[in-house]
Amino acid sequence: MEFTASPKPQLSSRANAFSIAALMSSGGSKEKEATENTIKPLEQFVEKSSCAQPLGELTSLDAHGEFGGGSGSSPSSSSLCTEPLIPTTPIIPSEEMAKIACSLETKELWDKFHELGTEMIITKSGRRMFPTIRVSFSGVDPEAKYIVLMDIVPVDNKRYRYAYHRSSWLVAGKADPPLPARLYVHPDSPFTGEQLLKQMVSFEKVKLTNNELDQHGHIILNSMHKYQPRVHIIKKKDHTASLLNLKSEEFRTFIFPETVFTAVTAYQNQLITKLKIDSNPFAKGFRDSSRLTDIERESVESLIQKHSYARSPIRTYGGEEDVLGDESQTTPNRGSAFTTSDNLSLSSWVSSSSSFPGFQHPQSLTALGTSTASIATPIPHPIQGSLPPYSRLGMPLTPSAIASSMQGSGPTFPSFHMPRYHHYFQQGPYAAIQGLRHSSAVMTPFV
């Protein structure tokens, strides 16, 4: 008995559009189209940066897209290495571009990091690189103009993790989907050849980020992936209007293997952290004061003494207050944070320039601002010096007592320990100021 297959039910055009077969085929075509438009060129670029030759033998990439090693041999062509990031041109680079050489500055510092395994922090807002890529060029035409730019390419298609028990990086799996590749054009471009011969080019403003939606021009990287910075130099022609079309331009690419780094969100190797703190001049906040040398410590102390913000103007000096006398004239003046270049203490300036209503400075006290050579003893506390003079017992001095004291070794100031703040300041800033401004306000001794 023969069985005949029943004919497939015919679906309408509207129903056929929502069938499983139609949805799968349309989804596959869209995914394929998106892959061809976005991922494919970048995948070729990733493979281009890690194929054929080891990084140790790579020195430069000419305009034909071929690597030039130290021995002068070029790698064999590979199906994986078909197109670099910068469009290649079939024209062989001119002799002028072939003569250009590029050297890495601070190579010794890069070597130290490379031995430990360089790590670079990436953040959402962007983080600058340290060490910084600094290069110098030779063999350029002094009369020509050049554009210098930099990009950072993945070393391989692997993701890494740090093994703390082994203090080394291990392969953790396949790399994450590649992020949009960006070229960083040096902000001072175009350079003249004469400028490139006289100065080095620093990419200190380059920032690394892991924000895929970054709109600030930072270089986007994946964490726990290894990257290789590359420096490009392009000869600018008269018709070069922008850097968007590089197909007709002559360029050279230089690679320095010691600049390979791993992008991280937090340092993994403690030795890298220590080396960055010790080498980075902007990381002094992380250093312990015990690491300072004697010369550095003396310079810091002298800097503190020269600036008035090092000590509050209403803070009393430690220990007993010095009084003006015969012994103080032979003793050098105690160092003060208020001492200026002309040895005029800030307290004397306050006492001579600011007065309160109802009080008139003695004539000899106002002369402190003009004659300081005869005074070799420290000036009392700023606020204390601004008050009417009192005897050692805390009683106000009469004008005759003041005049007699001026004829001797100078005015007599209280030697007992004074409270830190006057009761005017305990009222709050606004109330204290209003009290001082009142016409009938009279300053009273510290209580």
UniProtKB/Swiss-Prot annotation:
Major place of residence: nucleus
Keyword Nucleus: yes
Keyword entries, A-Z: Atrial septal defect, Cardiomyopathy, Developmental protein, Disease variant, DNA-binding, Nucleus, Transcription, Transcription regulation
GO process terms (BP): aortic valve morphogenesis; atrial septum morphogenesis; atrioventricular canal development; atrioventricular valve development; blood circulation; branching involved in blood vessel morphogenesis; cardiac chamber formation; cardiac muscle tissue morphogenesis
One Pfam match: T-box
Claim: Amino-acid biosynthesis is one of the keywords in the record: no
DNA-binding region: 109-288
SMART domains xrefs: TBOX
Protein name, entry field: T-box transcription factor TBX20
Gene name tied to this protein: TBX20
